[in-house]
Design a protein with these regions (language model features):
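C-terminal motif of bacterial Sec signal peptides marking the signal peptidase cleavage site
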Residues: 7-11
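Sec-dependent signal peptide recognition
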Residues: 1-2
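Cross-family detector of peptidyl-prolyl cis-trans isomerase
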Residues: 12-203
Length: 203
């Protein structure tokens, strides 16, 4: 399987504490928000219609996880129902916000056959998921079938389907994911990632 991008390790000095690393992470997130003119809205405001206004570059901040989310397309089809198991196909780009660099992607034309497949279950409103090791760039690079918790946050608010007409579009989100909700290298390196992800229902 061909891979796109390279994993970037964020180094730190031996004397740097976890608190210091978290401050640097927060600074990187705040810098990205400021540089890109992002309007952060509260959960209360978001829950009025479960939408983010892309013309205003709105992102909702989920306080409990620290994840920022912008819904670019709500998607076609239906939301994953409680008690349902679903196959979800994802295309994504991953940027390391600490180094401001593209780290990984399966979302370019040259690699159209590459798609990350997740097995997702919703139980009492909580989502759990694992990557299919036979079809996952994330697994190939990071060596784990665990899906970053940040990837699951949008699933409660988007529709999951397959386009049945030219007017149907699959769901797409942009999320800022702190290390606590990220892939294992981000957890170890204490760095945030920016993801653009599409979600499509698998067969």
């Amino acid at each position: 399987m061909a891979l796109v991008g390279a994993v970037v390790f964020t180094s730190c000095s031996d004397s740097e504490t976890y608190a210091d690393q978290k401050k640097k992470e927060r600074s990187a997130i705040n810098s990205y928000i400021a540089k890109n003119g992002i309007k952060v809205i509260s959960e209360d405001e978001f829950f009025k219609d479960s939408l983010t206004d892309t013309t205003k570059n709105e992102f909702v901040l989920f306080e409990s996880s620290g994840v920022y989310m912008q819904i670019i397309r709500k998607g076609c089809g239906e939301k994953i129902k409680d008690g349902e198991n679903a196959t979800v196909l994802c295309r994504f780009t991953e940027r390391n916000l600490m180094t401001d660099s593209l780290q990984l992607s399966n979302d370019i034309i040259s690699y159209a056959s590459l798609v990350d497949k997740m097995n997702v279950k919703r139980n009492s409103g909580t989502f759990t998921a694992s990557f299919d090791a036979s079809s996952s760039v994330m697994y190939s690079v990071y060596g784990s079938t665990s899906v970053p918790s940040g990837w699951l946050v949008p699933l409660a608010y988007i529709k999951l389907g397959r386009p049945a007409s030219e007017n149907d579009q699959i769901a797409k989100v942009r999320i800022i994911v702190p290390h606590t909700q990220g892939q294992q290298y981000a957890v170890q390196g204490v760095y945030p990632c920016l993801y653009d992800i599409t979600y499509e229902r698998g067969r």
